[in-house]
Regions:
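Conserved acidic residues
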Residues: 55, 115, 145
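Active-site-facing substrate-recognition patch
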Residues: 1-53
Length: 183
């Protein structure tokens, strides 16, 4: 299952990002270029993995976007981008978050009180981004029903976002500077 994705991940170079081992992959970084067959396998895999019982798909910038767009088109569910910069629009939700290698604010415009949301993410590393999103959404009356990721580096998805279904296509890691699949 997910043969193209597995092959692509295992070929990923690993770089040091301020002491954090970071794998570079077409799906998580857009580098090297994204093969359409690989993207299609990932999109189909996420659609099969998820329930998508939602009003909106949330796509964290940047690499959630190329995943959410084809899912939105295929399922007919609107998507909204979780941006790294704000617009100051009425109702804008501001989230402070920290990941394994960076921190900063995120901004959501679009979903409103009573909406049900699914987050589509390329990689869950520490779960910091999705935990921050879940708290912010809940405080604005938006129910996060599911988080779907291509890669899971957390090792334990059950703890990623308490009370929310979190699923990933592949469990992965980096050991001694090399990527590995944690099946």
């Amino acid at each position: 299952m997910y043969e193209l994705l597995r092959k692509s991940f295992m070929a990923s170079p690993v770089i040091d990002r301020n002491g954090y081992p970071y794998f570079v992959n077409p799906i998580s970084d857009g580098v090297p270029r994204v093969d359409p067959a690989l993207l299609n396998e990932v999109v189909e895999g996420l659609i099969d993995l998820g329930d998508f019982d939602c009003d909106v798909i949330l796509a964290p910038e940047a690499m959630g976007i190329p995943l959410a767009v084809p899912i939105s088109l295929r399922l007919g569910i609107p998507y909204s981008i979780v941006r790294k910069r704000g617009y100051g629009l009425p109702g804008e939700i501001i989230i402070d978050r920290s990941t394994g290698y960076s921190s900063g604010s995120l901004y959501i415009n679009g979903p409103g009180r009573g909406d049900r949301a699914v987050i589509v993410e390329d990689t869950l590393s520490t779960g910091g981004t999705v935990r921050a999103l879940a708290l912010a959404l809940a405080s604005h009356g938006i129910r996060l029903v599911e988080v779907l990721a291509v890669f899971d580096k957390t090792g334990d998805l059950a703890d990623a976002v308490p009370g929310v279904r979190v699923k990933a296509m592949l469990r992965v890691g980096v050991r001694d500077g090399k990527p590995f699949l944690d099946c």
